[in-house]
């Protein structure tokens, strides 16, 4: 690849086991339960990813606001262009929505640690954080890059480097699609079944039952 290319700190290593034997007294847990142990830690790791995403998106939004208040095009500040105002508003709204989801998820985990909720309670929230993570990150970083023009795609700003992490966020700790399935299954499991031929909100049936 040449001297101009390098492997950065975000690269994951390949590990290959060849006839590895583990002494019985060195085993953690029971045979076949390694995935369960890993899953116990992945939940917190996913929330950690989410928190870092909130922080980077906040930095990107701050950069957008600074750029809009400083850069002039066509005789006026970027901040005076309504399209730019819309980009900033959309980014702030999406960030605050995601921030609240992450905070609620962290609160749910604390409730489990305090013994006030069952261990499975935060799972759906964690999956929701993972699903939205890459989308919110993608949309806000993309707007920030566009607002900075050609400078946004250079390594003179952190935006291009952040942009390169969008795909990995959607894949790390299981792809987005897997977490969507988990969210849907959770809702379907708790859902109801129509009491008869028509849906539960069927107005004529409800009026008839009111008598």
Predicted regions and their residues:
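Active-site lining segments that contact anionic ligands and/or coordinate catalytic metals
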Residues: 10-12, 32, 44, 121-123, ...
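C-terminal helix-coil-helix/basic helical segment that borders enzyme active sites and/or dimer interfaces
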Residues: 65, 69-76, 96-132, 145-152
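Alpha-helix capping/hinge segments and adjacent helical runs
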Residues: 124-211
């Amino acid at each position: 690849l040449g001297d101009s290319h390098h492997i950065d700190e975000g690269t994951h290593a390949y590990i290959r086991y060849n006839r590895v034997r583990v002494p019985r007294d060195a085993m953690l847990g029971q045979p076949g339960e390694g995935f369960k142990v890993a899953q116990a830690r992945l939940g917190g790791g996913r929330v950690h990813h989410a928190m870092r995403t909130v922080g980077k998106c906040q930095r990107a939004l701050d950069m957008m606001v600074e750029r809009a208040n400083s850069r002039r095009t066509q005789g006026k500040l970027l901040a005076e262009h309504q399209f730019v105002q819309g980009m900033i508003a959309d980014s702030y709204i999406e960030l605050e929505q995601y921030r609240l989801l992450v905070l609620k998820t962290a609160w749910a985990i604390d409730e489990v640690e305090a013994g006030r909720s069952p261990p499975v309670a935060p799972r759906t929230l964690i999956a929701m954080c993972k699903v939205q993570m890459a989308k919110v990150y993608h949309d806000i970083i993309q707007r920030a890059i566009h607002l900075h023009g050609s400078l946004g795609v250079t390594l003179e700003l952190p935006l291009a480097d952040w942009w390169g992490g969008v795909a990995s966020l959607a894949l790390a700790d299981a792809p987005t699609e897997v977490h969507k399935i988990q969210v849907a299954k959770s809702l379907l499991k708790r859902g109801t079944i129509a009491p008869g031929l028509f849906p539960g909100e069927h107005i004529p049936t409800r009026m008839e039952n009111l008598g």
